[in-house]
């Protein structure tokens, strides 16, 4: 597929694409170490990017990529640790395909940051976000919904819906919901604790395993929705409800636990001088994480002239 003159919408909007999933999907299909498969991967990536750009009604697209390093590994020792337990071999052409995409399409990537974080940093303005990752829905603004191929608006407050077997969430409501439940995909415990246990019966009898004890999905939905619908500021009410649960579980150490879990889940929105990212804090205090040193920088002040997108 190629653009022609009739394809040019002249809208001034740019589609910001989480390209990791596009590249991975193509590499899973064409997984032979051959020039033929690599050519097919490039065709598939180009086609998908153009299709999404057309669906969003945008004039241009920027692909965002994840590198092999992540600042969250500097925060905790077990980020995504569950993925290492039964790690499958990566598609043989994956690294090559990422390099090709970076060299041949308009791309943004940064060591220590995921594509999700970069999408957060570059959000706003005349941009629309596309991603199949549920976590990106915490970023307010226009998103291209993958299932309907329609552009939808996510508000800052967000929404939370109990759909029975699944929970739909976005915006701050979704972020606070995840602060309570954690994210088992990335081994984020949320408002909970990991407890060593042993199977007492069955085929695994005697084997050790780790169980999470804490706020579960149904309880989290009730807590957040009750706070959301209470009188007053819904954003402040939801935040206080999350604070209360962490205080109940962790006592005097609640703030450290809350901010650690929140920053594992939070999509970065601000970066300065190519290394200092603004952290989420429960009381809105200014605090930055140094990507180079891998530590919180307590005395950093961003230059007044920067816009928070310096990569």
Q: PLM features: what roles do these ranges have?
A:
Residues 2, 7, 58, 82-310:
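Extended two-metal-dependent nuclease catalytic cores across DNA- and RNA-processing enzymes
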Residues 1-96:
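Domain-level signal for Mg2+-assisted phosphodiester chemistry and nucleotide/NA-binding surfaces
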């Amino acid at each position: 597929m190629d653009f022609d003159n009739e394809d040019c919408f002249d809208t001034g909007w740019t589609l910001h694409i989480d390209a990791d999933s596009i590249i991975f999907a193509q590499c899973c299909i064409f997984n032979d170490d051959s020039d033929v498969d690599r050519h097919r991967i490039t065709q598939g990536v180009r086609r998908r990017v153009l299709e999404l750009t057309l669906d969003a009604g945008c004039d241009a697209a920027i692909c965002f990529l994840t590198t092999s390093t992540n600042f969250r590994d500097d925060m905790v020792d077990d980020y995504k640790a569950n993925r290492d337990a039964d790690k499958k071999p990566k598609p043989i052409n994956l690294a090559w395909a990422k390099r090709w995409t970076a060299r041949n399409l308009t791309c943004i990537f940064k060591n220590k940051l995921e594509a999700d974080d970069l999408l957060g940093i570059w959000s706003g303005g005349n941009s629309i976000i596309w991603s199949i990752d549920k976590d990106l829905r915490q970023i307010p603004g226009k998103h291209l919904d993958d299932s309907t191929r329609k552009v939808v608006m996510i508000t800052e407050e967000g929404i939370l819906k109990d759909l029975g077997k699944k929970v739909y969430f976005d915006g701050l409501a979704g972020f606070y919901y995840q602060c309570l439940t954690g994210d088992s995909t990335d081994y984020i415990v949320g408002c909970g604790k990991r407890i060593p246990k042993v199977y007492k019966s069955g085929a695994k009898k005697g084997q050790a395993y780790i169980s999470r004890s804490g706020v579960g999905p149904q309880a989290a939905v009730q807590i957040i929705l009750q706070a959301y619908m209470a009188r007053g500021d819904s954003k402040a009410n939801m935040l206080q409800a999350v604070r209360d649960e962490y205080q109940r579980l962790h006592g005097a150490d609640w703030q450290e636990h809350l901010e650690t879990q929140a920053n594992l889940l939070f999509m970065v929105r601000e970066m300065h001088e190519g290394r200092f990212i603004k952290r989420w804090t429960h009381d809105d205090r200014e605090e930055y994480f140094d990507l180079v040193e891998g530590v919180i920088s307590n005395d950093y002040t961003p230059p007044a002239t920067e816009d928070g997108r310096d990569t």
